[in-house]
A protein has these predicted regions:
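Single conserved hydrophobic/aromatic residue that forms the stacking wall/gate
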Residues: 1-15, 371-381
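Short alpha-helix plus adjacent loop in nuclease-associated cores
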Residues: 124-159, 312-320
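Nucleic-acid-processing active sites and adjacent nucleic-acid-binding tracks
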Residues: 64-94
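Gly/Thr-rich phosphate-binding beta-strand-loop-beta motif of the actin/hexokinase/Hsp70
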Residues: 40-61, 148
Length: 381
């Protein structure tokens, strides 16, 4: 009755169906099915607002209006286990517990620690949860934990995909390489700015070519300025050599049995090389969870937003929700279509496509042709 009074039957447009189940110890458990979702009366949902130093925990059942049993503990999975043991003294040993926390600084570590003790755990994607944080005027750890618990209970969230250990290690390695790439970009900017402040300007065709680097090494600014430039160039050389070594290691990782076929297929596309292909594979994981390309684009935050009301239609830029790393790589890859030529494939692209099936190559070429024609008629992508 309490469920019907809350209007859930109207929301799902279906008549609720009740089940009475018998548990292992003879107790009775009740479950309701509405719109394909099974709500277990004997399930307790534990919301965890997790930080580096502390966890804020609370619990609620599906039929509860508010969460209860709030507790703030030091950041440790052992304290979560103690909290669950405390809840069992209240709800009984047969109670099913589902814990959840937002994707954030802890990554997958807390999830795996709890799973090792057979504790059911979910990582929630923040942008898909019941209540948008930006709309709230009061934000506390206690309220955050309650929102997580209620989202778990009412199934108003999307879970984060949990990668395999191999995928996660490969993902972290690639991100580490990209961090060094960002450092190299920064040191390049610092070198150019330093030279400009000292009155040196390169009049060649482009920066960071072999001729440009040779010109930088030939400069002889006065006094301590020479030592400063030498230190900058030393850092540049170290980072360049390290990136070459890391890129070679990524090539080795991509040649593993679990990755080689998928990487080979993805590199058939214009603008996608081994680094981007392997990043997409290990970051996304299971592509089968996306029923369409539109859903995948939404996951990456590449679909346009909208702020409309009544007859007013106001289109926004891309939502930028989801995986920032993959979105940046694919946006960079898309720039290749602004420079490609219709009907022409470079020697490098032909070498990447070599050895793949004709169906894969034809599909990649068709996609490239479509986008190149679109660029030809509409300008920049």
């Amino acid at each position: 009755d309490c469920l019907l009074s809350r209007g859930l039957g109207d929301v799902y447009k279906r008549q609720p169906v009740y089940y009475e189940l018998e548990t292992n110890n003879g107790n009775r458990d009740y479950r309701i099915q509405i719109g394909g979702h099974y709500m277990n009366y004997n399930t307790v949902y534990v919301g965890m607002d997790v930080h580096k130093e502390s966890f804020t925990l609370c619990s609620c059942k599906y039929e509860d209006e508010k969460a209860s049993h709030y507790q703030r503990t030091p950041a440790s999975y052992k304290n979560v286990l103690r909290y669950l043991a405390f809840l069992r003294t209240i709800y009984g040993e047969d109670t099913r517990f589902v814990c959840g926390y937002e994707a954030g600084c802890l990554g997958y570590s807390l999830y795996h620690q709890l799973e090792n003790f057979n504790v059911e755990c979910v990582i929630l994607a923040p942008t898909t949860m019941l209540e948008q944080r930006s709309k709230r005027r009061i934000k506390t750890d206690k309220r955050d934990a309650e929102i997580i618990a209620r989202s778990l209970a009412q199934h108003n969230y999307s879970p984060v995909h949990i990668p395999t250990e191999t995928d996660n290690q490969t993902k972290e390695f690639i991100r580490m390489r990209d961090d060094h790439k960002a450092e190299l970009k920064k040191i390049k900017q610092q070198i150019l700015s330093f030279c400009l402040r000292q009155g040196y300007q390169y009049d060649g065709s482009g920066n960071w070519t072999a001729k440009h680097v040779k010109w930088l090494r030939s400069l002889k600014p006065a006094g301590l300025y020479k030592e400063i430039l030498d230190e900058y160039l030393l850092t540049y050389t170290i980072l360049t050599d390290k990136l070459n070594r890391l890129d070679q290691r990524i090539e080795e990782l991509a040649s593993k049995e679990e990755y080689t076929e998928s990487v080979s297929k993805l590199t058939c596309f214009l603008g996608i090389k081994t680094h981007t292909a392997l990043s997409v594979i290990v970051e996304v994981g299971d592509f089968q969870r996306f029923v369409s390309a539109r859903k995948f684009a939404g996951y990456l935050g590449l679909v346009p937003g909208q702020h409309s009301s009544g007859d007013d239609r106001n289109g926004l830029g891309i939502t930028k929700a989801g995986n920032t790393h993959v979105r940046r790589l694919l946006v960079e890859s898309a720039q290749s279509y602004t420079r490609g030529k219709i009907g022409y494939k470079s020697r490098v692209l032909r070498s990447r496509q070599a050895g793949n099936s004709p169906q894969v190559i034809n599909y990649a070429d068709t996609v490239s042709y479509t986008h190149l024609r679109a660029h030809e008629t509409r300008g920049n992508l």
